[in-house]
């Protein structure tokens, strides 16, 4: 059952009201948003520029990769829940489409507002997708226990706080964070975790639908592979052209490879009977791209990237195995997707790695490239040690914004008119979607199984089973 008639009537009205939200956004775009000089036909040709020099040709390939990651990678990574696949992909689509518009306005007012207008181009598109990524990270922490109206309100608040935090870090404190270990991963993770703590529901610990099935975990691996392949582009998307962008992609590439090996090694070590856990592989193998987010543009060295990636993969795997149960039982945080292990802890490690590498920066190591990586050091306004301290202070600022914002967001999402799904309907697609009338679940052990062969539930054939329609 999808719920009572009154609840169904409320849902019928909630999402159509999005047209008013889209209309308000469109009005703000009409008043404030304009093409920048690299996009406007008259301004570009007035400068007698060659089309080959347009920023589009340098940034758009990275934008394509980032865009695919946000809409395909994040969405499919969350389809592991056995009865929440439509919602995982569909609400990712909805949230990202709204967040990229709203963040264009928020970031525009903070970063590119001059002459009374916000000026947009391919860089603003990438920045908007970055912000949408942070929102989707937070979504992962509350996946399955929030409705679309609640999620949109979460995005409305989080995008504003994301923009303010980013402005404080990058423009006021002069923090360097090319791949977003601080601004994207740490902020998004702890915003979502505090939000989840405020929305804690003790009865959900008993839900049988919080786990994956063979086919749902397989689909989630599609998201993992998408993110794994394209993450060097994500970290390098807005770094300085030339050596900086090249170095960022290289460091991310090696860190991802090392985190994957670390994940496989630790998963087998801590797994039952030495077997791999697909949850570890889906998630912890990606921790390498988070841990080098801050330092990927710096002279981390290939060895440093490998070491950092391996450490992140092992820490993330151990987090899924040991810390997630503690997080729920002791701290009342129901972290559905394990964002603390994939984004939170690796994000903090990434910030600390950035502190170390920034503190070791010298003119000899960077040469003329110091200006593009650490402009304040190159100009003599800061020492390397001072830059490192600002990097560390940026972590505390981020945690403050994330914690306060997540707490406030949790209180807002508890408002009764937002139609939070009841405990019995959490992690269920049919609450918000016209789901098919049958689902897939594992069969009992087949009669032809070899006697004495170790039984593996994940490898059982699949059968069609009538959907559980009880409220």
Curated annotation (Swiss-Prot):
Catalytic activity: NH4(+)(in) = NH4(+)(out); methylamine(out) = methylamine(in); CO2(out) = CO2(in)
PTM characteristics: N-glycosylated.
Keyword Acetylation applies: no
Membrane topology term: Multi-pass membrane protein
Record keywords: Ammonia transport, Cell membrane, Glycoprotein, Membrane, Transmembrane, Transmembrane helix, Transport
Stored InterPro entries: Ammonium/urea_transptr, NH4_transpt_AmtB-like_dom, RhesusRHD
Region span, Interaction with ANK3: 414-422
Any GO BP annotation: ammonium transmembrane transport
Glycosylation sites per record: 48
A Pfam short name: Ammonium_transp
Molecular function per GO: ammonium channel activity; carbon dioxide transmembrane transporter activity
Residue intervals on the Cytoplasmic side: 1-13, 82-85, 145-148, 201-217, 271-280, 324-344, 413-471
Gene3D superfamilies noted in UniProt: Ammonium transporter AmtB like domains (1.10.3430.10)
Family as reported in the entry's similarity comment: Belongs to the ammonium transporter (TC 2.A.49) family. Rh subfamily.
Record's function text: Ammonium transporter involved in the maintenance of acid-base homeostasis. Transports ammonium and its related derivative methylammonium across the basolateral plasma membrane of epithelial cells likely contributing to renal transepithelial ammonia transport and ammonia metabolism. May transport either NH4(+) or NH3 ammonia species predominantly mediating an electrogenic NH4(+) transport. May act as a CO2 channel providing for renal acid secretion.
Subunit structure comment from the entry: Interacts (via C-terminus) with ANK2 and ANK3; required for targeting to the basolateral membrane.
Xref: PANTHER family: AMMONIUM TRANSPORTER, AMMONIUM TRANSPORTER RH TYPE B
Protein name: Ammonium transporter Rh type B
